């Protein structure tokens, strides 16, 4: 009888642990897009190219963070539709977004390539190439 009670207690504890662990975090909703991406190259529509140092896009849920290490960090909202990425940076200034390949506080990017390691975004203003960091 005691063995049956101990077995039931262990079963209940195991179920509770599984429930607690599974409830602790948000699952990624954007597939391969979620994570931190380092900008490797920006090709502007004008033909100019730039290879920024230590500039990143971080994507999680419906939030995007643009960060240039020791310089700036901008946070906004984004919507991922599979072939497009819509970014809205409501409190940012345009001049703060230029180093990230954006020329406005609202930007639509076409997703030209997306794998677990490589991302290419295209807007009317620039083409951005990233590697997963």
Predicted regions and their residues:
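Tryptophan-anchored aromatic micro-motifs
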Residues: 32-47
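Short, exposed beta-strand-loop hairpins at the edges of beta-sheets
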Residues: 108-129
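Bacterial N-terminal signal peptides that target proteins for export
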Residues: 2-13
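An anionic, turn-rich surface loop/hairpin at beta-sheet edges
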Residues: 87-112
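C-terminal motif of bacterial Sec signal peptides marking the signal peptidase cleavage site
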Residues: 20-23
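N-terminal glycine/threonine-rich, aromatic-flanked beta-hairpin/loop signature
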Residues: 49-92
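Bacterial signal peptide processing site
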Residues: 25-28
